[in-house]
Amino acid sequence: MHLLVLQHARIEHPGIFQKFLKEDGHSWEVVHLDEGQEIPSIDSFDGLWVLGGPMDVWQEQDYPWLKKEKAFIKMAVEEKGIPFLGLCLGHQLLAESLGGVVGKSETAEVGVMEVQLTEEGASGILFAVSYTHLTLPTMM
């Protein structure tokens, strides 16, 4: 599998994922959007990963490349059916690209949080793939 990785800041890189990808025989190409690199055609890639970053999805005036990136994500996912992984900002960009709304939370949610799964969410394919669960270890 050959992946296109969109990176928004030098410090927000693929990190440990590079080791896992290499061990499994996958290749990737990183595009540094914050450095002005252009997004290549998706046609030579098998998947799209969009990483995190310090900006917000609505800051197109400060980060003008966000508008082009959102259009690219929409095209890649809707028109081409490219598998997508979004981390932090990446999943927010996907949501907005496909018509969702992303806004600032009233309170920050950092770390492990308890969430409530809605009936609509429970019927989605993401939660139909695996019926396992985990319990986090107690911190010492």
Stretch-by-stretch model annotation:
Residues H133-M140:
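Single conserved hydrophobic/aromatic residue that forms the stacking wall/gate
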Residues A128-V129:
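Cationic, amphipathic, low-complexity alpha-helical segments enriched
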Residues E35, L117-E119, T138:
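Non-catalytic surface loops within mature trypsin-like serine protease
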Residues M1-E79:
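N-terminal beta1-alpha1 cap of cysteine-dependent amidohydrolase-like domains
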Residues A9, G15, T118-I125, T135:
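Secondary-structure junction/capping motif
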Residues L51-G124:
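Cysteine-nucleophile active-site neighborhood
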